[in-house]
Amino acid sequence: VSPFPPWVRLVIFDADNTLRRVTVPDQPCPHGPGEWEPMPGVRDALAGVRWGPGGLLMGIASNQDHIFYGHLSAEMAQRLLMDAAEAVTGHRPPPGAVRFCAHAMDAGCACRKPAPGLLREAMDFHGVGPAATLFVGDAEVDRKAARRAGVAFLHVADLLARAQSTMPPSRGSESPSVNQKT
């Protein structure tokens, strides 16, 4: 059973503390293989989802300013994000659906969450509009990015709770976990 409402065609995930968590103390994101593990419970929560052709489309939207600061390359960031998605969902998203901001935290760019740029890029890649898109994240910047992009938002903690209850809400639900106007 999918934990997502039936109107969803595209699920965009944040990466850190949503799909994966860092295993290196005092490091906010992984810089290489072996420095992360799947977020506990997320793999099980997504086990009933069919991804790819005939199923849901997937994207990733992640702030990766560690590229700007020289801690990892853009290629490594892309690989680690795709590896995390595959480890958690069993499906490797197409590279064009994996979007990240490599700018400095204070760059003021249009892509760094809470700006909506990364979400819009993932939707454009898949040809899916905001009304059929859900963004799953863990932070207030994720919620704000979803609102600014006009897409529904689901907190990862609510995803885990929903997966246990197996009762997806309807579109326009008053539930705080999936709401167009959060």
Regions found by a protein language model. Name each.
Residues V1-L57:
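Active-site neighborhood of HAD-like aspartate-dependent phosphohydrolases
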Residues T18-R20, D65-Y69, D106, D142-R143:
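Short, active-site-adjacent cap segments at secondary-structure transitions
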Residues D26-H31, Y69-A77, A107-A110:
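Short, flexible/disordered intra-domain loops and linkers
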Residues V42-A84, P95-A104:
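Substrate-recognition element of Asp-dependent hydrolases with the DxDx(T/V) motif
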